[in-house]
Every structure is written in structure tokens, then in C-alpha cells.
């Protein structure tokens, strides 16, 4: 590590050059974008069971649904087994949809899972991140 050289390239991207081999290794950054409550959990079958399997820090996937009949900017949120948990709320999905459409890697981490005391209602709060190279 002491032989590494830190450089800024012509696009302003910081890279690390290994003086021994000259290999370019980007700094991988996890960029926090927003926090939201997953929408539509009340319409997901077996939601309570799926929610019980989640803990703070559980990673969730963001999947674009450009052909969604209710919202052409829809972003589905799936658990680690690929099962639907719900959606990014419509009022927060436009920029995220554009990033996903542009090939950016977005994902979420569960921040909190709350179960209603007298019903089967579940509130899942997730933090959305972009992995930037």
C-alpha cells in the first residue's frame, strides 16, 4: 500500500496506481441516495412472512419495470431470494429509474421493519445506494 500512487484522471475520477505493476484500481464508493418506505407491501402475498426474514442491513435488489401498467418509471424491490417486497414510491422513483436505465448499479439496504400491532400491515424502510466505480 505504501507504494500506491493516488491520481486524478482527465475526467476527475480518482484512481490508485500500484507502483509495482501499474494496475489501475478504482476506489469503489457506496453512495447513499435516499431513504424510503417500500410502497405496495399491502398487496404482496405472504408479506408478513417475507418481512420477518428481513433484518436491518439486509440487501434488497432494485429491478426496473418499464412496462408496468401503472407507472412506466416503476422500480420493484426484491428480497435476496428474488421475491417482490413492493416498489420504490412513485414520488421518489424518477431519478432512480433514469440511473438504472443508464446502467448504474443501485441496491437497497433495509433500515427498519415495523409490524402493525393489530393488523398484518408491515412498513419496511430501506436506504437506496449507488455503487460507483
What would you call each of these model-derived segments?
Residues 1-133:
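Conserved active-site motif detector
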Amino acid at each position: 500500500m505504501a507504494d500506491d500512487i493516488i491520481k486524478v484522471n482527465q475526467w476527475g475520477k480518482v484512481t490508485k496506481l500500484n507502483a509495482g505493476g501499474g494496475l489501475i484500481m478504482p476506489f469503489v464508493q457506496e453512495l447513499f441516495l435516499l431513504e424510503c418506505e417500500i410502497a405496495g407491501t399491502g398487496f404482496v402475498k405472504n408479506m408478513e412472512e417475507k418481512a420477518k426474514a428481513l433484518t436491518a442491513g439486509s440487501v434488497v435488489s432494485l429491478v426496473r419495470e418499464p412496462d408496468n401498467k401503472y407507472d412506466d418509471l416503476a422500480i420493484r424491490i426484491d428480497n435476496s431470494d428474488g421475491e417482490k417486497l413492493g416498489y420504490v414510491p412513485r414520488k421518489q422513483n424518477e431519478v432512480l429509474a433514469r440511473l438504472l436505465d443508464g446502467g448504474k448499479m443501485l441496491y437497497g439496504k433495509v433500515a427498519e421493519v415495523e409490524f402493525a400491532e393489530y393488523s398484518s400491515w408491515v412498513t419496511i424502510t430501506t436506504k437506496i445506494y449507488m455503487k460507483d466505480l
